[in-house]
Every structure is written in structure tokens, then in C-alpha cells.
Regions:
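N-terminal nucleophile
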Residues: 1-203
């Protein structure tokens, strides 16, 4: 049988997290992910982050890991196609670059964050991870922005959440490199951005 869609894992949290539905399973990010983990093996592989601004909590779970759902400590983290903070060259490099950028400017333009991730440079061979795939493919996948004829980065999204008093501002920018047919197209062919405010509940 086909695996169920992973999209509902996001929409379920967004639609019912604040309401504390499912007998309290969605009350907090960590409680929700523990609920998800009970049936996590029925889905294709995923990393899932869910957060609650009022609680200042962000939690992570990967259904291809033996690690239990966990709250993230404050700081700069990274996720690639593995578990949280796996020390692959591109993750280590981009996490350091992001930290440096935020030190210089705590509110960088979203476009700058997107540009940071759209880096096609591959890692030197002596820094490549050993994941069991051919060396040529290991090289290609070591780039933050992957470009191959049959596989590549489809989109890059930057999300920023800030607060002023009881108002939370959410800003999103996205640059797409795919026309919906799974074919790589010219970089930046589709771009979109939006922002909205949310009045938060204080717990």
C-alpha cells in the first residue's frame, strides 16, 4: 500500500495545535511529535519541525532515526537529508555562514538568506561523507544547491518570525527552480513572497 501523505503532519499541527485537540496530543510541539512518532514508521522518510511562538519552543523528529522527538536548544541548527545537525560538509558550512550573517545583521533580508542557500559549489573529495552511493553522485549531492539532469533543488524558502508585543509577524520568501513537472528550469524562474501578522496567545 502507498504510504500516507506527509503533508497532513504539518496541517494537523497548524490547524489543531492551538486548540489542544486529540486529547491533548497537540498541546505542545514536543507532545505533538511524540504523538506522530507512535505511527511514524508508516510514512516515507521525513524530518519534521514544529514550533509554538508563545512557548518559545521548537521541536524536531525524524522517522528514520532511533532518536526520540526533542526540543531544540537555542542557537543555529541545520538539517540536510539526514538527522538534525549531521556533520555533512554543506550543513556545517551553511550553519556557520548563517551564524556569521546573523551576528552581523540579526534581521537580514529574506533574499539574502535564500542567496546563502543557493550555493552550487561541491565539497572536496576528502570532505565527502560516505553514504554508500557512487563518488560522482556523492560529489553532486554535497552542494547546498543541487544541479543534475535527473535530480536537483526544486525550491528555496526563507521564513522569518518576529514579535512586537502581542503581534507576531511572519514573512516568507521563496524562489522556485521547478515548473511542476520535476524538470529543472532556469534558476529563479518563479519567485514569490508574502507576510502576515498573528495575534498571539500568551500561555
Amino acid at each position: 500500500a502507498d504510504a500516507p501523505t506527509r503533508g497532513t503532519l504539518v496541517s494537523d499541527w497548524l490547524s489543531s495545535g492551538a486548540a489542544g485537540a486529540n486529547n491533548g496530543a497537540h498541546e505542545t510541539p514536543l507532545a505533538y511529535l511524540r504523538h506522530v512518532a507512535q505511527t511514524g514508521d508508516i510514512y516515507n522518510g521525513f524530518n519534521l519541525l514544529v514550533g509554538d511562538w508563545a512557548r518559545r519552543e521548537l521541536a524536531w523528529y525524524c522517522n528514520r532515526s532511533n532518536l526520540a522527538p526533542a526540543l531544540l536548544a537555542p542557537g543555529t541548527h541545520g538539517i540536510s537529508n539526514a538527522i538534525l545537525d549531521t556533520a555533512w560538509p554543506k550543513l556545517v558550512k551553511k550553519r556557520a555562514e548563517l551564524g556569521s550573517l546573523l551576528t552581523r545583521n540579526a534581521m537580514p533580508p529574506l533574499e539574502r538568506l535564500i542567496d546563502l542557500m543557493r550555493d552550487p559549489r561541491v565539497a572536496p573529495d576528502d570532505q565527502l561523507p560516505s553514504t554508500g552511493i557512487p563518488l560522482e553522485r556523492e560529489r553532486a549531492l554535497s552542494a547546498a544547491f543541487i544541479e543534475t539532469p535527473e535530480y536537483g533543488t526544486r525550491g528555496t524558502t526563507a521564513l522569518r518570525v518576529t514579535a512586537l508585543g502581542d503581534i507576531v509577524n511572519v514573512a516568507v520568501a521563496e524562489r522556485s527552480d521547478d515548473n511542476g513537472s520535476h524538470r529543472i528550469v532556469r534558476p529563479g524562474d518563479f519567485e514569490r513572497s508574502f507576510a502576515f501578522n498573528v495575534e498571539r496567545e500568551v500561555v
